[in-house]
Each structure stands twice: as structure tokens, then as C-alpha cells.
A protein has these predicted regions:
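Divalent metal-coordination and catalytic microenvironments
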Residues: 1, 61, 109, 145, ...
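Active-site beta-loop-alpha junctions enriched in small/polar residues
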Residues: 1-4, 66, 90-93, 112-116, ...
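Divalent metal-binding pocket/active-site signature
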Residues: 1-95
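Acidic (Asp/Glu)-rich catalytic clusters
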Residues: 52-55, 75, 79-80, 99-106, ...
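Structural preference for beta-strand elements that scaffold enzyme active sites
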Residues: 60-62, 84-86, 106-110, 139-141
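Short acidic/histidine-rich active-site segments
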Residues: 137-154
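Mid-to-C-terminal alpha-helical segments outside catalytic/metal-binding sites
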Residues: 158-199
Length: 199
């Protein structure tokens, strides 16, 4: 099948990303003061400390599960410091206008294939496709967010997610960019070889 190479490259990029990023996982528990300061466009000192660590280790800031105004405050400062960033789970709670603003800062926008396994999967997948098109394929990263016992294994799930993207009209080249090239660029990897047959 013509998209088999896309699945192969996607799996490779995902595994490379996991190996490189797991070394620098830092979890921060948000509190009310942090939320208030972010609403005013400020960050608590701990955020600056974490951004310093990320910069020192050439690591990636993966931010999600916080309010859009907090996201903007954090990622503006990350951009100012030269920290590569991705906003996770953008399809859930980050308005398209905010995604566009983040993309303009050089932030990658992650969209999770977990939506393909929800009860309302058709509508969720269509909504994600619309968001990707509104912001631009060049800013999108498509991952799975899988790993739960009731869902498929991540490599299988990524193949299903790729099929969903193709059904939404994305080309093989666009899918490859979202599942391989953009993740590779995020983690600072070298450009990949072209797919077999130059597609």
C-alpha cells in the first residue's frame, strides 16, 4: 500500500523522539498563584528556572493542560530564551486563534490520534483536521497519546491515526511532514532520507 512508508517513518520518528525527550521530563504542578501571574502575562520564578534548565540541556518544552493565557505567557518567554517548544493536546481547549499565535512564535502544535478511538471519533477527527489546516501542516505534529490498556499499542494506533488523516484529505507528503519531519525538527534531528520512490 502506498502509505506503508509513512507509517514506518512515523514509527521511527516517534521512537527517536521518545528516546531523546524522556531524559529531560520535568513535571510542574500548577497552583493558583501561577495561574494569576500568567493571566497578567508574568511567570512564577520556578518557570524561569525550568526554562533555564531546558535551555542549558538543549531540551524541548512540552506544555499542555494549562489555560490558553498561561500557555501564551510561558511559550512567549520560551521563545525569548530560544527554547524549542510544542503545545500538547492542542485540539482540546486551545482555540485556533491561540494555536495560530503560538505557531507564529515557532511553537509546534501537537494533535493526538487518541481522538480516533473516542465515541465521537468522526467529529473529533474532522475538527482536528480543520484546526491543522487553519494553522498549517508545517506547524503540526501528529502523535497518538496512546499507552492506555484499553487502547491499541502506539505503533498500531499511529497507523490508524495516519489512515484517519488520509481520509480527511491530507496528502502522503503532508502526513509525512506531520509524523516525521516536524517531530524530527522539534528534537533537533537531522533531515531524513526521502521516501522510497521519491513520494
Amino acid at each position: 500500500q502506498q502509505y506503508d512508508w509513512v507509517r514506518l517513518f512515523a514509527h521511527t520518528a516517534q521512537m527517536e523522539g521518545i528516546k531523546n525527550l524522556q531524559r529531560f521530563r520535568i513535571n510542574v504542578v500548577p497552583d493558583a498563584m501561577a495561574a494569576q501571574q500568567a493571566a497578567a502575562g508574568n511567570l512564577v520564578p520556578a518557570c524561569h528556572d525550568i526554562l533555564d534548565l531546558l535551555h542549558a540541556h538543549d531540551a524541548v518544552l512540552a506544555s499542555g493542560h494549562i489555560a490558553p493565557n498561561e500557555t501564551l505567557a510561558l511559550l512567549r518567554e520560551a521563545r525569548r530564551r530560544g527554547v524549542r517548544s510544542v503545545i500538547t493536546h492542542a485540539s482540546f481547549g486551545i482555540p485556533v486563534e491561540v494555536q495560530q499565535e503560538l505557531a507564529a512564535l515557532g511553537v509546534f502544535i501537537e494533535h493526538c490520534g487518541l481522538a480516533a478511538f473516542r465515541a465521537d471519533d468522526g467529529e473529533s477527527v474532522r475538527s482536528i483536521a480543520e484546526q491543522i489546516r487553519a494553522v498549517g501542516v508545517e506547524h503540526a505534529i501528529c502523535s497518538t497519546d496512546l499507552g492506555q490498556a484499553q487502547n491499541p499499542d502506539p505503533p498500531l494506533g499511529l497507523g490508524i491515526w495516519i489512515d484517519c488523516l488520509i481520509e480527511q484529505g491530507f496528502t502522503a507528503s503532508e502526513v509525512r511532514q506531520m509524523v516525521q519531519e516536524n517531530p524530527r525538527a522539534l528534537i533537533g534531528g537531522p533531515p531524513s532520507l526521502p521516501p522510497p520512490g521519491g513520494h
